[in-house]
Amino acid sequence: MAREFSLAKTRNIGIMAHVDAGKTTTTERILYYTGKIHKIGETHEGASQMDWMAQEQERGITITSAATTAQWDGHRVNIIDTPGHVDFTIEVQRSLRVLDGAVTVLDAQSGVEPQTETVWRQATEYRVPRIVFANKMDKIGADFLYSVSTLHDRLQANAHPIQLPIGSEDDFTGIIDLIKMKAEIYTNDLGTDIREEDIPAEYVDQANEYREKLVEAVAETDEELMMKYLEGEEITNEELMAGIRKATINVEFFPVLCGSAFKNKGVQLMLDAVIDYLPSPLDIPAIKGVNPDTDAEETRPASDEEPFAALAFKIMTDPFVGRLTFFRVYSGVLQSGSYVMNTSKGKRERIGRILQMHANTRQEIETVYSGDIAAAVGLKNTTTGDSLTDEKAQVILESIEVPEPVIQLMVEPKSKADQDKMGVALQKLAEEDPTFRVETNVETGETVIAGMGELHLDVLVDRMKREFKVEANVGAPQVSYRETFRASTQARGFFKRQSGGKGQFGDVWIEFTPNEEGKGFEFENAIVGGVVPREFIPAVEKGLIESMANGVLAGYPLVDVKAKLYDGSYHDVDSSETAFKIAASLALKEAAKSAQPSILEPMMLVTITAPEDNLGDVMGHVTARRGRVDGMEARGNIQVVRAYVPLAEMFGYATILRSATQGRGTFMMVFDHYEDVPKSVQEEIIKKNHGE
C-alpha cells in the first residue's frame, strides 16, 4: 500500500503544559475538529478520549503520553499528549525525543507557570520548535498580553503574537489574524461557524501596532526580509509566513496564538498554525546514530528509500493485545510480520502486528513509513530508548536519558497469593516505566520500589491493585546502614565446652585493622608452627564472615575490616570446625570493645536546580539535612547546587522542594559513598534497633 500522506504533509507534534492549563481539553478539540471523535469528552466529567487510564479519569490529570493520529487540511498530524506533573517527567522527555514540534499550552490567566518552565527547558535541550497557545481566554482574569510578557520574562523566549483576542472572559468573541489582518468571529457554540470580517474599529490601532512588531521581529531573523524592512518595502503575507516558518523551525522564534479550547474557539486556527509553522520530518536535521560494528557516526535522513531505523519510546500493556511497543520511524519502511534488529540489545525481533493508536482504541495497519508513529505487538526484548533497525544496515540511535529514581518505599503482599501476583505486576510496570525500579533488599528480604516522587509511586501502587488485583501494604522506606572499625586491636576468642563425651575446643588470637573504603573484608592466615591446624583455618574465616553479617552495634553488616589470624591453640580430640567458628565470632565480639566501631550511612550526591529567588531556601534545606554544599553554578536565572546529603535525610524532600519553589525546583541524587554517622545519630539508630 502506498503512502497516504507524503513526508512534507506529516507533522509529529506534542502538546505540553503545566498541570491544569487545559492541555487534554485542547487535544480533545483537535480530535473533534479533525473528525476523530463525534462527541467531545470533558476532563472535568472524566470522559476525556486521551486520558484513558482509570486513575487519569479520576484524578483529571494525564499520566501516560497517549499517541493518536488525526488529519487536517490534507495533512497527517500525529499527536502525543504529555503529562504536566513533575513526577512524570520521563513521559515528557521520551515524547520530546520523538517529536518534530510542539504546542505549548498556557493558561491565559496565569501565563508561564512552574511546570511550563520545566517542560520548556526540556524542549529547548532537545531543540524542539514550538508554537504557543494561550488557552482559557474565556476565564475570569484572562489576559493575553500578560501571558506573552511571561514568555519573555520567565523563559527569555523570542515569542510574539500572530493573533490578538477580541474581548476576554465572557466577552471573548473572536480572534484577529495579524497576518491576514482580518477578524475571525465565532457565531455558534461548537466553534464550527466562523465569520471572517474586517477588524472592529476599536481594535484597528492595536492590530496595526502588533502587526508592525511581528514584522520587525521576523525580519530580525532573516537577512533578506531585514533589507526589505529597512528600505521601507512592503513584506507580503506569503513572505511573512515563510519567515515565521523558517525562524520557528530554527528555534529562533515562537508564534503565540490565543483561544478557548473549552468554548471551542481558536483550535482550528491553532491547527492551521501547526501545519503552517511546525516542521515536517524533512525540515529537521537527519537523526544521528552509531554503527555498532565500526563505532562510526551515521545519519538516517527522513526518506522511505533509506534503510529502516526507528526508536522505541514507550512500552505499554494493553488489556486486549498484550505488550505494545510505541516507536517513531525515522527512515525506511516496515511491514508487519517482518524481522528487525534491536541494535541496543543485539537481539533480533519479529514485528507481529502494527497498530495505529487513537488514545486507547487501535486500527491495524500493514505498513509504516518514515515519519510515522505507531505501536508494534510481539516485541519480546525491546525497552524504552532501544533502536530498531534494518538487519542489513544496523545503527544505534541516541537513546533516551533516564533520570535516577529519588524516592523509595517498601511494599509487602498481604497474602501468599498476592506475593506471586506482585512479582509479575512489578516486573510489567517496570518494563513500561524506566524511572520505576524494583529491588529486593537482601538484608531485610523486603521488596523496595523506587520512583520519581510520591504521586508517581501512588499511581503505580494503585495500578498494581486495579490492573493486577494485588493487595499490598506500603511501608516507610528504610536506609541500608553499614558498620566498620575505626581503630586497630587484638582480641582472643576462646571456646571450651566439656561435658562428658566429646567436648568442644577452639582458641584464636586475631588482629583487626580498618581496611580502605570499599575494599570489604580481607582475611590473612599468619599462623606459624601449626598452633592452629590448617584444616581449621577456613572455619575461622567463615566464623568471622557469618558474624560480620550481623554487625556489632546495631545489626548492620560490618565492612572494610582486615583480620589477621596470628596465634591460638587446639585440643587433639575436642577441636572441630564448629568450635573454631564459634571462637572466631567471640574474638570479633571482644574486638568490638576497643576497635571503635562506627555506623556508616549512604551519602548521596544531590544536584538541586531551582530559581535564583529560592537559593536561600535550597541552602537552608541542605544544612538542615546534615548536608554540605560542594559547588554552585548559575544558568541564567536558575541556580544549580551540588551537595552531599545523607540518604536518611532525603525522604520526603521532593515534596518540600516542590512546595518551596512552587514546583520549579527539581533534584536528582545518586549514591556516592558511605560516611560515619554523627555520634548523636548513631545512638538513636542503636536505640531504635534494640527496641528501646
Curated annotation (Swiss-Prot):
- Job description of the protein: Catalyzes the GTP-dependent ribosomal translocation step during translation elongation. During this step, the ribosome changes from the pre-translocational (PRE) to the post-translocational (POST) state as the newly formed A-site-bound peptidyl-tRNA and P-site-bound deacylated tRNA move to the P and E sites, respectively. Catalyzes the coordinated movement of the two tRNA molecules, the mRNA and conformational changes in the ribosome.
Question: Domain of life here?
Answer: Bacteria
Ranges for domain tr-type G come to: 8-282
Subcellular location(s) per record: Cytoplasm
The family database entries (PROSITE patterns) matched by this protein are listed as: G_TR_1, G_TR_2
An example GO BP is: ribosome disassembly
GO MF, one term, reads: GTPase activity
Keywords assigned by UniProt, alphabetized: Cytoplasm, Elongation factor, GTP-binding, Nucleotide-binding, Protein biosynthesis
Q: What is this protein called?
A: Elongation factor G
Q: Which residues bind GTP?
A: 17-24, 81-85, 135-138
